[in-house]
Amino acid sequence: MTESGDDHPRRLRVSKELRGLIRNLHPDLKRKVRAALKENLRDPGVGKPLREELGGLRSFRVGRIRIIYRDSAPHIDLVALGPRRQIYADTLRLLKRAR
Protein backbone atom coordinates (compact mmCIF):
# COMPACT_ATOMS: atom_id res chain seq x y z
CA MET A 1 0.00 0.00 0.00
CA THR A 2 1.47 3.34 -1.03
CA GLU A 3 0.18 6.87 -0.62
CA SER A 4 1.73 9.87 -2.31
CA GLY A 5 1.58 13.25 -0.71
CA ASP A 6 3.83 16.29 -0.83
CA ASP A 7 6.26 14.38 -3.09
CA HIS A 8 6.94 11.94 -0.23
CA PRO A 9 5.47 8.53 -1.01
CA ARG A 10 5.02 6.45 2.12
CA ARG A 11 4.80 2.70 2.16
CA LEU A 12 3.04 0.51 4.65
CA ARG A 13 4.94 -2.63 5.66
CA VAL A 14 2.74 -5.42 6.98
CA SER A 15 3.82 -8.93 8.00
CA LYS A 16 2.15 -11.97 6.43
CA GLU A 17 0.61 -12.76 9.82
CA LEU A 18 -1.02 -9.34 10.09
CA ARG A 19 -2.15 -9.45 6.45
CA GLY A 20 -3.94 -12.71 7.22
CA LEU A 21 -5.50 -11.23 10.34
CA ILE A 22 -6.82 -8.24 8.38
CA ARG A 23 -8.03 -10.49 5.57
CA ASN A 24 -10.11 -12.51 8.06
CA LEU A 25 -11.81 -9.53 9.72
CA HIS A 26 -15.53 -8.94 9.29
CA PRO A 27 -16.02 -7.09 5.97
CA ASP A 28 -17.26 -3.87 7.64
CA LEU A 29 -14.35 -3.80 10.08
CA LYS A 30 -11.89 -4.71 7.31
CA ARG A 31 -13.11 -1.73 5.27
CA LYS A 32 -12.69 0.58 8.28
CA VAL A 33 -9.20 -0.75 9.04
CA ARG A 34 -8.07 -0.27 5.43
CA ALA A 35 -9.49 3.28 5.36
CA ALA A 36 -7.70 4.06 8.64
CA LEU A 37 -4.42 2.69 7.27
CA LYS A 38 -4.73 4.92 4.20
CA GLU A 39 -5.33 7.93 6.47
CA ASN A 40 -2.28 6.91 8.46
CA LEU A 41 -0.15 6.89 5.30
CA ARG A 42 -1.21 10.48 4.64
CA ASP A 43 -0.54 11.58 8.21
CA PRO A 44 1.47 9.18 10.40
CA GLY A 45 1.00 11.52 13.35
CA VAL A 46 -2.71 10.72 13.67
CA GLY A 47 -2.04 8.05 16.26
CA LYS A 48 -1.40 8.49 19.95
CA PRO A 49 2.28 8.13 20.94
CA LEU A 50 2.79 5.21 23.30
CA ARG A 51 5.01 5.49 26.37
CA GLU A 52 7.35 3.55 28.58
CA GLU A 53 8.25 0.13 27.15
CA LEU A 54 6.20 0.81 24.02
CA GLY A 55 7.87 4.17 23.41
CA GLY A 56 8.57 4.82 19.74
CA LEU A 57 5.28 3.21 18.73
CA ARG A 58 1.95 4.86 18.05
CA SER A 59 -1.61 3.59 18.35
CA PHE A 60 -4.91 4.56 16.80
CA ARG A 61 -8.43 3.28 17.25
CA VAL A 62 -10.75 1.74 14.69
CA GLY A 63 -13.91 0.75 16.54
CA ARG A 64 -12.86 -1.69 19.28
CA ILE A 65 -9.61 -2.45 17.46
CA ARG A 66 -6.28 -0.74 18.12
CA ILE A 67 -3.65 -0.55 15.42
CA ILE A 68 -0.07 -0.29 16.69
CA TYR A 69 2.55 1.03 14.28
CA ARG A 70 6.02 2.56 14.02
CA ASP A 71 6.79 5.52 11.78
CA SER A 72 10.08 4.52 10.14
CA ALA A 73 10.08 7.10 7.35
CA PRO A 74 9.64 6.50 4.48
CA HIS A 75 7.85 3.41 5.79
CA ILE A 76 5.15 2.83 8.32
CA ASP A 77 5.57 -0.56 9.96
CA LEU A 78 2.35 -2.15 11.16
CA VAL A 79 3.33 -3.87 14.41
CA ALA A 80 0.08 -5.26 15.82
CA LEU A 81 -3.67 -5.11 15.58
CA GLY A 82 -6.25 -6.27 18.11
CA PRO A 83 -8.77 -5.39 20.82
CA ARG A 84 -7.73 -2.76 23.35
CA ARG A 85 -8.04 -5.06 26.36
CA GLN A 86 -5.06 -7.16 25.25
CA ILE A 87 -3.22 -5.48 22.39
CA TYR A 88 -0.73 -3.49 24.46
CA ALA A 89 0.36 -6.52 26.53
CA ASP A 90 0.52 -8.67 23.37
CA THR A 91 2.64 -6.03 21.61
CA LEU A 92 5.04 -5.83 24.54
CA ARG A 93 5.45 -9.63 24.52
CA LEU A 94 6.02 -9.57 20.76
CA LEU A 95 8.71 -6.90 21.07
CA LYS A 96 10.49 -8.73 23.90
CA ARG A 97 10.54 -11.95 21.86
CA ALA A 98 12.01 -10.09 18.87
CA ARG A 99 14.98 -8.78 20.90
Each language-model region and where it sits:
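Conserved catalytic core of Hanks-type protein kinase domains
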Residues: N24, N40, L81
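Active-site micro-motifs of SAM-dependent methyltransferase domains
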Residues: G20, E39, Q86
